[in-house]
Amino acid sequence: MSRVCELTNRKKSFGNKVSHSNRKTKRTFLLNLHKVTLTSDILNKKFRFRVATRTLRTIDYKGDLDAFLLNTRTIKLSEKAQKIKRRLKKVLVKQEVELAVSDA
């Protein structure tokens, strides 16, 4: 299992460890990944992800998984998240069509 966020595709980053004497040595910054189950209200389905805590905070800020996926640019999402986003959009379009038909 690689240490990659399954929603945003974030990977480990690289940098320098700087000592008190300002000596620099190479190091890696690993993600703080957690296994979580997130629920989609629109699809009425649960999804399991390995997600970075930064992504979890963003999901909380946006409101829920659906709002996060719909408000995030597709380029920034992983393949798995892009598939879920496409399914969300299909369901939303279908609901709008049903509303338009029922109003007419």
Curated annotation (Swiss-Prot):
Keyword hit for Thylakoid: no
Domain of life: Bacteria
Keywords from the UniProt entry: Ribonucleoprotein, Ribosomal protein
Alphabetical list of InterPro entries matching this protein: Ribosomal_bL28, Ribosomal_bL28/bL31-like_sf, Ribosomal_bL28_bact-type, Ribosomal_bL28_sf
GO biological process, one term: translation
An example molecular function term from Gene Ontology annotations: structural constituent of ribosome
An example Gene Ontology CC term for this record: cytosolic large ribosomal subunit
Pfam families: Ribosomal_L28
Keyword Ribosomal protein: yes
Similarity annotation: Belongs to the bacterial ribosomal protein bL28 family.
HAMAP family per record: Ribosomal_bL28
Record's protein name: Large ribosomal subunit protein bL28
Source organism of this protein record: Wolbachia pipientis wMel
Gene designation: rpmB
